[in-house]
Amino acid sequence: MKVAVVGAGTAGLYCIIDLLETLPEFVKIDLIHSRFINPIEVGESSLVNFPHALSCGVDYVHHFDSEELGSTIKYGVKFKNWNKAGFIPFASGSYGIQFDTTKLPQFVIPRLHEMYPNFSERLKTVKEIKSLGKQVSVDGNKYDYVIDCRGYPEDYSDYIITDKVYLDSGIVVKSFTPGDWEYTYHIAHEHGWMFGIPLQKTTGWGYLWNSEVTSELEAQSNPVSYTHLRAHETHE
């Protein structure tokens, strides 16, 4: 049996770790991805199942591996300026991690090569994934199963597009001052809300708004000054 995972972002790597860790060794599993497609460099926040999957699948130990992954501990979520602001912790003894998305492939893929003889990596930009009935073709190469984790599709023609998305625009801002809080930050603001993800050397901020209410120029004038202000208020 042959399985392919297309894409080496968080979804693709999470998927292939789970497949390799749970499926028998006779199942050959390929990771197909392009080094010319880069992740969004803002950092990513996870729930408690993600460090557990890394631990089971690639022997991740936060105490020893956090620097290589640029990761920090996450004990929950903190809300500010919402109707019911406050800290919502994970269950006792549980934690997630916040990590550098650019470092995740560099950390995971070498360990997959070392730990799983049925793992292969193919570097290429996939042009076509096509169902053949009982098999699937990836640019002419046949697999029994293919999991497409490439992210945003190029063609939305077979999607149902809703007009009920209240926050339809966003920008990300990287602060080179690392956050010293152990949670993901969620701040309501006059145009929508924003998140803050503390990493070891930087902090990633995402600023979200509704384009029908707020212009792009108006929205872009706020995040930098807003993040500097909020970064000093995190422990209030």
Located regions from the model:
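A structural signal for isolated positions on well-ordered beta-strands in alpha/beta enzyme cores
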Residues: A4, K28-D30, G206
